[in-house]
A protein has these predicted regions:
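Extracytoplasmic ligand-binding site segments that recognize negatively charged/polar headgroups
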Residues: 72, 94-241
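Extracytoplasmic/periplasmic substrate-binding proteins
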Residues: 231-296, 341-347
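C-terminal capping/gating helix-and-loop segments adjacent to ligand/active sites or protein-protein/ligand interfaces
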Residues: 317-387
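N-terminal secretory signal peptides and thylakoid transit peptides that target proteins
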Residues: 1-19
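Early extracytoplasmic/lumenal segment of secretory-pathway proteins
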Residues: 33-100
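A bilobed periplasmic-binding-protein/Venus flytrap-type ligand-binding module shared by bacterial periplasmic
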Residues: 154-160, 196, 285-299, 318-319
Length: 387
């Protein structure tokens, strides 16, 4: 498996299919009105069976093409292929893509005054000096709008284990040998391992999101040692395998995406918990970008309507309800309380509270699928896989 292929996107396609079907590329709903925007996005951007509710809310027509899991494909298509002609807007494949696209002149700088919901963004994103400011900026200029975010953590089966956990340590503890799993992707797995090793004092790692070569080697060798000792039941690939591992009881704890935990808990009818790890988590957001060519074609008005809708509590609460993802925006609790007939308000407020607890952990590290030493990450991850 190519390491740059970010596995979350495999889940995005699979989850959308189970939640109502993935539309064929380039669909334009007949009943939609307003300006048309050609959108190339991950299916997770649509928390509805069709785009029609979003189109009605935004006042636009969406001609949608589902986006694949490959970051390599996205870079190739938008930088040297026909992507700029085919699409007006597109989503990313993980942290750092906005830098590559802006640097190569693919995407347009954004005018935030054209989005009335821009001020709903949390300070850590909106403030140029905020912790997450980099995730939507290039050279201090804004090029992207976030639509979902999370802090990935550890899921554990409290029904089986009989207690709560607030540390990554049990994932590497021989007590649970053969009953734990991690993701088959160097990004999240090496990042959370680096967070644990650094915060527990076992290694000194300056930047857990962008490690130096010797740090990459140290983290990989730790994983190799654990793997050779039989610590891991497996390294999971894709949403369905993750759900099956947890729901079946084949593993009792696993690093994973929050929707995997939510679906597995329901499938197993057990108390499978998504914890808050005291060492930290991999934090991320996904973004939508406007191509420069689309701005020249006059599609920018439709883009700002799309982006503004993504920032609205109407959209973010529906993302939370359907997929368990939140947003780096405010106003969700007020919206939930104002629309109790549309949501399980108590459950979603509890989910948001747990997210806030994870966001607040000092040791968190931001997702980065384009680290400076990418080749070293790839080479050492290959050794982990082969061990």
């Amino acid at each position: 498996m190519k390491q740059i292929d970010f596995n979350r996107r495999l889940f995005l396609q699979g989850l959308a299919a189970t939640a109502g079907g993935v539309a064929a590329a380039g669909i334009t709903p007949a009943l939609a009105a307003g300006p048309t925007i050609r959108l190339w996005s991950a299916p997770i951007m649509r928390p509805f069976p069709t785009w029609e509710p979003f189109e009605e809310q935004a006042g636009i027509t969406i001609a949608w093409s589902p986006k694949s899991a490959s970051a390599d494909e996205a870079l190739s298509k938008m930088m040297v292929g026909d992507g700029k002609k085919l699409y007006d807007a597109f989503t990313d494949n993980g942290g750092g893509m906005e830098d590559a696209m802006a640097e190569n002149g693919v995407i347009a700088e954004l005018d935030t005054s054209r989005m009335k919901n821009w001020n709903l963004l949390r300070d850590e994103v909106r403030d140029p000096n905020g912790e997450a400011a980099h995730s939507i900026r290039y050279n201090d200029k804004i090029f992207a709008v976030p639509y979902i975010a999370n802090a990935d953590s550890l899921a554990y089966n409290k029904t089986v284990l009989g207690q709560d956990y607030d540390s990554w340590a049990p994932l590497f503890d021989p007590e649970f040998k053969g009953k734990v799993a991690m993701q088959n992707d160097f990004g999240p797995t090496m990042t959370v391992t680096a967070i644990y090793l650094h915060e527990s004092g076992q290694m000194n790692i300056k930047d857990r999101s962008n490690m130096a070569k010797d740090e990459i080697q140290g983290v990989a060798e730790y994983l190799i040692e654990k793997k050779k000792g039989g610590q891991f039941r497996t390294f999971w690939n894709g949403f369905q395998q993750g759900v099956d591992l947890l729901a079946s009881g084949e593993v009792v704890m696993m690093s994973c995406w929050e929707p995997i935990q939510r679906v597995a808990a329901g499938k197993a009818s057990q108390d499978i918990v998504y914890g808050t790890m005291k060492e930290g988590h991999q934090v991320w957001n996904n973004i939508v970008m406007l191509t420069k060519d689309a701005a020249k074609r006059g599609v920018d008005d439709a883009f700002y309507k799309l982006a503004d809708t993504c920032l609205s509590p109407w959209y973010t609460t529906r993302q939370l309800s359907r997929f368990g993802f939140a947003s780096l925006t405010t106003g969700m609790v007020d919206y939930l309380e104002a629309h109790p007939a549309d949501f399980n308000v108590a459950d979603l407020k509890a989910t948001l509270k747990r997210k806030e607890q994870r966001y607040a952990v000092k040791g968190n590290a931001w997702q980065n699928v384009y680290p400076k030493e990418l080749r070293a990450y790839q080479e050492w991850w290959s050794r982990v896989q082969a061990a």
